[in-house]
Amino acid sequence: MRLFASSGQAATSPALAHSSSDEAGEVIENSHTKRAGCSVLQSSGGKSRSLERYSGAPKIHQQTLEMLPPYATPTCSTRRRLLAPFRSLKRRSRSSSSSNESHHFGNHLNNLVVVNVGAAAANGGVAKAKAKASSQSGDSGTGGTELEHEMEQDDDEEDEEEGEEMDELSLSYSQLSSSGCEEAEAPPEDVPDDRQAAVEATVSACVQHVANERRRNILSLYSSSSEEQLHCRLGDITLVDDTYSNYDPQNDAERMFLQVVGILRDENEKMRQFQKILEDLSSRVALAEQTKTSWLPPSSVGEANEQMQQLQRLRDKMTTASALLDDCNEQQSFFTANQVLVPTPCLSKLEDLNTRMKLLQIAMDERQKVLCQAGAQQTHENGDDGRTTSNSGTIGPLPNLGQSVKPPWERATTAANVPYYIDHERETTHWDHPEMIELMKGLADLNEIRFSAYRTAMKLRSVQKRLALDRISMSTACESFDRHGLRAQNDKLIDIPDMTTVLHSLYVTIDKIDLTLMLDLAINWILNVYDSQRTGQIRVLSFKVGLVLLCKGHLEEKYRYLFRLVADTDRRADQRRLGLLLHDCIQVPRQLGEVAAFGGSNIEPSVRSCLEQAGISQEAIDGNQDISIELQHFLGWLQHEPQSLVWLPVLHRLAAAEAAKHQAKCNICKEYPIVGFRYRCLKCFNFDMCQKCFFFGRNAKNHKLTHPMHEYCTTTTSTEDVRDFTRALKNKFKSRKYFKKHPRVGYLPVQSVLEGDALESPAPSPQHTTHQLQNDMHSRLEMYASRLAQVEYGGTGSNSTPDSDDEHQLIAQYCQALPGTSNGSAPKSPVQVMAAMDAEQREELEAIIRDLEEENANLQAEYQQLCSKEQSGMPEDSNGMQHSSSSMTGLSGQGEQGQDMMAEAKLLRQHKGRLEARMQILEDHNRQLEAQLQRLRQLLDEPNGGGSSATSSGLPSAPGSALNSKPNTLQTRSVTASQLNTDSPAKMNQQNGHYEHNSKNSSGLVTVITEQELESINDDLEDSSSSNTTNTTTTTTTTATTEKTCVELQK
């Protein structure tokens, strides 16, 4: 790479061919002398690559200075900093280059003098001209002393020897240059004065002519150079080519020289990027100004809403432009701090852009006020209650969320910005908004729905409508996530203010909503699902998943987006990422108390099922290898509607069926037309049911729950009618045993009893850890206490069914209690599961039985004591009537003994009541164990260890062809009512509408038992004793039966 002061090196005349670089150096050096007193680095093309000095440039006119570009005017300090490493290099190269330069310049002037003077000049004149040329050559040889003095002044600590050496070098340059000219031709001694004056004038005119020609050539080079050629200049140095790009330095000076060249390149690249950003920013601002000129006053509310949306989009664009402008201002400050000269046009453009951006911001604010006034005026004319009815006034600052509640309620926030609500009338505080409490209480009415999948879908649909999330498209939500910088931030945390900002940008796109109330309810719902501990922060992944699941969009598009959230750069997801996604999805039904019907809270079985469906071997899964799946594998698994996520496609079908009208009459409630789901029996001819009758499990005379049915969410076609008639005809010839032997399940069951180690908790940081279940004994105590309370108060839920405590809930509870070790000792097979449960349950039962036997022994001993006392207190003498005094004493003694006996009998009856309550618990527990054992027997009898386990989980079943079809929201499903899950939801707190999870403690069992109502005090003591003996015998028999069954199963 060469360092020149101009980008051209060719001269316009042959006389300038060998000195174009020198001419450029003279002109630029002259301009630097006028402006900042700086010099220029140059290297001649035909000479060595060492750094050479320039001779002093002649003075030029001020107009010539103004014609030069501004890049050629750096500060003196910048030039000194760049030239400082080359002092030693300059000293070594000075002696080798100065003589050649002076000799060429002398010959050049000699030729010019001969051509102009001609024959009229005498020998003396020629000699005088040569002497003049020698003098000029000496000046040229000793020129650049200005550069030397400047460098010597920068280094005041140099010794005097270096100064003397430089003087000697300068003197040798002058002598060598002068001697070079004298060797050509010696001047004659005698020359007339008039001729000498004429020759001097001629030579002066020639020199001035040459200087002018050189200046014109340099200026023509600048004028002919394009902006692209000139913008590469940095200060007084121009990067012309890459001569030194591959040069291998031979000494320290050359290495320092190349380092400076690299610094110049970096500065040049920064300047080019700076100019490029300015050009881009200028085009953005110009486009925004063009949009501003097209603004018109709104003529209607609809037009005002549309213009407000356009204004919001313009604001989003200008946000990016403002960020670019801030970067430019920071870069300009960096250049100034490092004494890098920024071109004047760039500074002017930057200042102009700052001014235009401020004017645009003011114009957008004024425009927003105009649109807000138009929306408010229309609202006043419509006579509304003061709430926002359109999004025309919602863009801008966030609304005051304190206005979302009305007296006597008050909204307050914690230190972590978590909202809570104060009821001044009852003097209570709640985490939930009053509207959310009413919503959750209203969901309790849906507990009458018999089947879990439809019950969960109905609840989610109610929440979706109340929060207006069904009016927000998934594309809008994704754009809002990206616009607020949430892309690729899924492992980080988001606080409540940021969530409110994102939700605000979503709700402003909806008309006729109470924006403040919707924001508060949405925040409340998200915190209930993902932050029940109210820490004030959730993961960004959870926030996105919670909104995408309930927003409007196609089902397959949601599946694809959810997979992209957890996929890596190779578009693959491993076990951990997949577990995080499924964990966040399962929290939605868990909040509604419906998680037991979908495989429980543990997501490991679902992950295992997905990997197996993708074709990954069981050995690879158990070996904790580095395995991952692609999008097609994930979609293929979801196409089968897995048990943990089956509620999501049911929700989509429910939303699609809301407006569907079927030209058929319900054979049970006689509704016509059927609105919503339509269920057609595939065994009974011309038998239809509406969704209400089907959900609540109603039945007709000839129709039974075991009959297969087909579900329609859209209007049927003639082809479907013919197909259903053919199916009904075929099913007429099939027996009941056939349907029991071939159950048709339309979802992919999750084998909870086969689960292995629990996956790691989805906790990205110590600040936010997911609550993990403690010892499962706590949940068992809660279950026992709730059942004992039901027995005590004599009431059970109206929505309970005989199968409400079936194997799904039990399997989930037992599997959660299994030790999750990392050494591979976790039970994987039904036999291991049974062995683990047997060891735990046997200890509990034996401990309870020992307590009961000990209490029974104490009661028997007390009973024998009472009997002996009663017998000993009776009179032994038959003639006791003869002694009246002794008779009276005996009667009084018997009366005291009777009172003691009554008191002890009362205590015994109370103890009997407690024993009976405990025995009821043991009997219930025994029935659960028997059901579990029966279930495990079925799993062992099957050849592949699964398949029929889904017959009791009960979600909509589907034909086999639907499993291979493309997932579709509006697909029809085959349903058998007897195969549907009838699990009851979790108990809801009637005070605040929450579904309780592990909200009780072990003391609740003791409290309920001590408050158990007792039987009548008139029962005699013998009945109490006999009942206790019978209860103990029943307990022993139950335990023996359980142990015997366990032994048989293990065999």
From Swiss-Prot:
Which portions of the chain have biased composition (kind: Low complexity)?
A: 129-139, 169-179, 1024-1042
Q: Give the main localization category.
A: membrane
SMART domains, per the entry: WW, ZnF_ZZ
Q: Where does Zn(2+) 1 bind?
A: 666, 669, 690, 693
**In which residue ranges is the amino acid composition biased (Basic residues)?**
85-94
- Binding-site residues for Zn(2+) 2, renumbered to this chain: 681, 684, 703, 707
Gene Ontology molecular function terms on file:
actin filament binding; structural constituent of muscle; WW domain binding; zinc ion binding
Following inactivation of the gene, the phenotype reported is: Flies exhibit muscle degeneration and lethality. Flies that have reduced expression of all isoforms (due to transgenic RNA interference targeting the common C-terminal region) exhibit severe muscle degeneration in larvae and adult flies. Muscles were either ruptured, absent or the fibers were detached from their attachment sites at tendon cells. These are necrotic, not apoptotic processes.
- Please note every region of biased composition (Acidic residues): 149-168, 182-191, 1012-1023
Q: Which PROSITE patterns match?
A: WW_DOMAIN_2, ZF_ZZ_1, ZF_ZZ_2
The record's Pfam families line, in alphabetical order, gives: EF-hand_2, EF-hand_3, ZZ
Q: Record's superkingdom?
A: Eukaryota
Q: How does it sit in the membrane?
A: Peripheral membrane protein
Q: Which Gene3D superfamilies match?
A: 2.20.70.10, 3.30.60.90, EF-hand
GO BP field: actin cytoskeleton organization; establishment of cell polarity; imaginal disc-derived wing vein morphogenesis; imaginal disc-derived wing vein specification; maintenance of presynaptic active zone structure; muscle cell cellular homeostasis; muscle cell development; muscle organ development
GO CC annotation, single: cortical actin cytoskeleton
Q: Where is the composition biased (Polar residues)?
A: 1-12, 879-891, 962-993
Give the UniProt subcellular location, in the record's own words: Cell membrane, Sarcolemma; Cytoplasm, Cytoskeleton
Keywords assigned by UniProt? Actin-binding, Calcium, Cell membrane, Cytoplasm, Cytoskeleton, Membrane, Metal-binding, Phosphoprotein, Zinc, Zinc-finger
Region: Disordered, residue numbers: 1-53, 85-106, 129-191, 376-406, 870-898, 941-1051
Q: Which residues are modified to Phosphoserine?
A: 761
According to the entry, every stretch annotated as the WW domain falls at: 403-436
Oligomer and partners: Component of the dystrophin associated protein complex (DAPC). Interacts with Dg, via the Dg WW domain binding sites.
Check the record and name the PANTHER family matching this protein. Answer: DYSTROPHIN-1 (PTHR12268:SF14), E3 UBIQUITIN-PROTEIN LIGASE KCMF1 (PTHR12268)
| Functional description taken from the UniProt entry | Specifically required for survival and integrity of the larval musculature: the maintenance of appropriate synaptic retrograde communication and the stabilization of muscle cell architecture or physiology. May play a role in anchoring the cytoskeleton to the plasma membrane.
**In its UniProt entry, what is this protein called?**
Dystrophin, isoform E
The organism named in the record is Drosophila melanogaster
